[in-house]
């Protein structure tokens, strides 16, 4: 079951109802509103008409870092160093590549807003490069001890998976305790993602937000 939350320009009510927001009337999603939504376990997605909806899935998909499944072939790819992994060097390109598919929930309004959050140090990208070209990547929102994965793309074998492994290693090293993947898909399930009830997710989110994790040493 997925709950849809109504959200006005300045508030996020707790009553679950549907909201459709015409793109022409919402050229920019308030970044502060967006962060407040994430802190309540709510996130936005656009439909094919450009309207933004707010989601709070129940159950919620998460990745327990110790449960990440790394296949032998993926381990071999990582060991061979086929891809160069970078962080935060091409955020907007990663997001645009994630959006470049037949059906996408990422529109220009979201790209503009997440760009602002990236410059504020709250959104991050992990990238796989080969021969100077970006061939895979992912991005998400980092809030205290929680990381909310948003999307990933791959244009070469295992490129996005290599990014995920690098992300998990980074999050563990920095002390993050909650890795939210929002929805469960067969692809994510194969990597070790599972579901928990929303009430449990909210408890874990509150606990994660009590921490003071930073993305890198320079943020401390």
Report the location of each language-model feature.
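N-acyltransferase acceptor-side catalytic subdomain
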Residues: 4-220
């Amino acid at each position: 079951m997925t709950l849809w939350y109504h959200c006005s320009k300045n508030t996020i009510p707790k009553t679950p109802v549907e909201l459709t927001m015409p793109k022409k009337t919402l050229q920019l999603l308030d970044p502060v509103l967006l962060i407040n939504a994430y802190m309540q376990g709510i996130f936005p997605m656009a439909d094919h008409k450009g309207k933004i909806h707010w989601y709070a899935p129940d159950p919620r998909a998460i990745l327990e870092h110790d449960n990440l499944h790394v296949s032998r072939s993926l381990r071999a790819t990582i060991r061979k160093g086929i891809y160069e992994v970078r962080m935060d060097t091409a955020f907007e390109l990663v997001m645009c590549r994630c959006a470049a598919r037949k059906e996408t929930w990422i529109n220009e309004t979201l790209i503009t807003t997440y760009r602002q959050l990236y410059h504020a140090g709250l959104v991050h990208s992990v990238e796989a490069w080969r021969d100077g070209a970006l061939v895979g990547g992912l991005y998400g929102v980092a809030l205290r001890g929680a990381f909310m994965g948003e999307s990933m793309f791959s244009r070469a074998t295992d490129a996005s998976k290599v990014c995920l492994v690098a992300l998990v290693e980074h999050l563990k090293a920095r002390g993050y305790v909650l890795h939210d993947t929002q929805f469960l898909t067969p692809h994510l399930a194969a990597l070790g993602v599972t579901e928990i009830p929303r009430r449990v997710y909210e408890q874990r989110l509150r606990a994660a937000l009590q921490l003071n994790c930073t993305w890198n040493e320079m943020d401390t």
